[in-house]
Curated annotation (Swiss-Prot):
Residue ranges, annotated region (Disordered): 1-20
One MF annotation (Gene Ontology) recorded for this entry: GTP binding
Protein name as catalogued: Up-regulator of cell proliferation
GO cellular component, as recorded: cytoplasm; nucleus
Function per UniProt: May be involved in cell cycle progression through the regulation of cyclin D1 expression.
PANTHER family: UP-REGULATOR OF CELL PROLIFERATION, URG4-RELATED
Keyword annotations: Cell cycle, Cytoplasm, GTP-binding, Nucleotide-binding, Nucleus, Phosphoprotein
Gene name for this UniProt entry: URGCP
Keyword Cell cycle: yes
Amino acid sequence: MASSGHSDLGEVTSEIKASERRTAVAIADLEWREMEGDDCEFHYGEGPNEAQDNDFPIEERSRLQEMLFLLGLETYQTQKLSLQDALQISSDSMKNWAPQTPKDLPWNFLRKLQALNAEARNTTMVLDLPLDTRPVEKESQMEEEIIYWDTAEDISADIYSFSELPTPDTPVNPLDLLCALLLSSDSFLQQEIVSKMSLCQFALPLILPDPENHYHTFLLWAMRGTVRTWGSQPPRVMGSFREDSMVLSRAPAFAFVRMEVSSNSKSQLLNDVLSPGHRQQDCFWHRDLNLGTNPREIADGLVEISWFLPSGREDLDIFPEPMAFLNLRGDIGSHWLQFKLLTEISSAIFILTDNISKKEYKLLSSMKGSATKYYFILSPYRGKRNTNLRFLNRLIPVLKMDHSHVLVKVSSTDSVGFVRRVRAIITHVTRSPCRRVSVEDMANAARKLGLKVDEDCEECQRAKDRMEQITRKIKDLDAYRRDELRLQGETWRKVAQVEKELCQIQWASDPPEKYRAELRHRLLELRMQQNDHDPSWGVQEFISGISSPSLGEKQYFLKWMEWGLARVAQPRPRPSPEMIFTLRPKHCGAVDFSEPFWPEPLGVEHFLREMGQFYEAESCLVEAGKLPAGQRRFAHFPGLALELLLKGLPLELIDGNTLSPALRWVTGLLKELHVRLERRSRLVVLSALGVPGTGKSTLLNTMFGLRFVTGRGRGPRGAFMQLIKVAESFSQDLGCDHILVIDSGGLIAGVRTEAGERFEREASLATLIMGLSNVTVVSLAETRNIPPAILHAFLRLEKTGHMPNYQFVHQNLHDVSALGSKPRDRRQLLDQPSDVGRATVQMEKQGDGIQTLADLAFWDPEKQHIWHIPGLWHGVPPMAAVNLAYSEAIFELKRCLLENIRNGLSNQNKNIQQLIELVRRL
């Protein structure tokens, strides 16, 4: 058996040399005969477009329309399917059902992909027939009666009818479903699909065939959102983990293709190469999987890509460095343009075939002079072996091969040893000088061959140019914040402090009027200082970008800004998570990954925060009568930001630096939302609170397909909100038109800092968010460790009588065996030690009467459920498989939340006007 660690080339060298000797002897025994017939040169098309048109015969042009009609996607060819269409809440969001017709397949795929369900690619359909029409076993109709056979009658096939459940007439190949869905989606849904597929460890579509329009599309834009983290060997104490966009990261590329017929499964071989010995991982869909042998109607010509990424542990890693693996679906002769691209970007190409004849020789001899290494994996027919050897002997000098480049795999071949040998070849290639390419490099090569690149549309390029103009001026993050984002400096912190004091004395029984007047005067002076500034050049360019009349260009610009700002930010070296867990004291609970290792990044939210401060300052002066309403310059800012919220961008509700809400800005946003939604303004507010590193944001993203920032050190420090649309057909049943989801920053898990300023701010943050919410999800690192800020908020809200529905979630981040909700752990949470409870109660000056959650008056174990969620990964990332139990548990939690909303357990749903009043009051 091969070691689960890195491949050892020396271990396999003897096998390769023995094979070389056997192959050399076989060729030497053959008498070389010159090939008969015409000249063997292969003439490539005069131009790339001509070659591309020939990739699809004319009679295949209707196949796409037939497939789209079968899947119910024909209406999305002019008006593409959007991300908002795919994410809206409907009655199907609460059902865990198998697709019954082909028209169910696209939506089933999108729902399961959003939930990171490893079964998303399964296109098996189950027909749901009425009970009276279902075939049943005859004996079941007779209960316990004895069956007597009439000897005069023959036993007919009817006795098997109970097992002959009807199956769909038209099974759909999973790759056809993927291609049809991508061709029916806009650029942003395509990007979301590819990003989720990457998280599920599925192979990603790189070149999308389009048999209707005869143009293949290189999916560069769709790949832009794919970001992965991997380790290095040997691991270093600091900086041993690297996070990068897979579009920009360079790695050796290896392509696997089929020539004519191959008895060996190319995709299965790829999976074997990428999978550790103890666990099979099906990155590439192959013939041995369900419906894998079903004929492909529109997916031939698809090129997929997947990466091997090391964990930094030699005992686990198959290869010591990242590597890209490409897979061409279909025969290279029918998809020559894709094959030619693969020869220009790959370090080595493995060609699987059963036979090499004159036709194949013509094709391959045209690659003379190629710098790529070629390897053949043969499974020859008995009567064709001599022919194969003859043509191989001619190809060896043409493709600069030697006999070690020919591998034979037949049914009797040891599969484990063969995979070990292929890995050894790949390792050998990477140890010698070889090309390393990024997806951007691949796209450049594709352009030269005439392939369409999805990123080359005018809207996308204009947005990219504007982003580059902004980010080009960012040399130092601290200096840029100080000089360009001036309203977020010390003045804003003073404003937040004054507003906090005003809020505190507002609730005092006998507020001192003189002190209140002083605070208001001080606040007005600070706001006047802010209003004296004009937006900097960078902020003005940002405003121009989101003010574009083209909705597509606006969305492209926001995406480009996210990536551009991420590239210019220079994070501090990242230690491995294991190192942090090793160094931290055991009593510290969950790790706060935000400091001291990661500085605050620069993101789109900082530009929007600057806009919010200009709006706040101007509104304050108008309210005080210091500025005529007709002279307002920034009154349109909330409308611009609202457009982004409606298109799925998280907007900041509470500033992460001061943990203070920009009241006028948030109110302005909600007023704009009320106007925009008109009659469909009934809201349910769902929030999530918890300590850092508990998977809270990932949980929300998985449950609803949201875009909250995830990852240690990058999560929100304040609170962000996103809006989910409820389908009109379901809104009456659910009782709301939209769900507003709030994701908060991490809260302190320990008790030692309770008396500090940070705890007070976090308690206020938790109180505000929970006070706005109908449903609150509390994410815990341990069942016995509830953040004191949350307990503090419980006590405050209990006075107001506002008690949302609470769901406690404990994510088992390191153990995939945690299943279900355990009564024993629920009891532990209810009866957890009273240190935190007593300390919190003492701050509220309510004595020692309340010591656990179970002592709180609002607590109802039947309504406040405790969930134990298994870990997301089954194994060690980055090559770990997604844990199916995680997806299933998240779906059950989502269904419970929606059921509680529908059944009214989440308290009275709000309209936007009521939410505005709550924000002001809290």
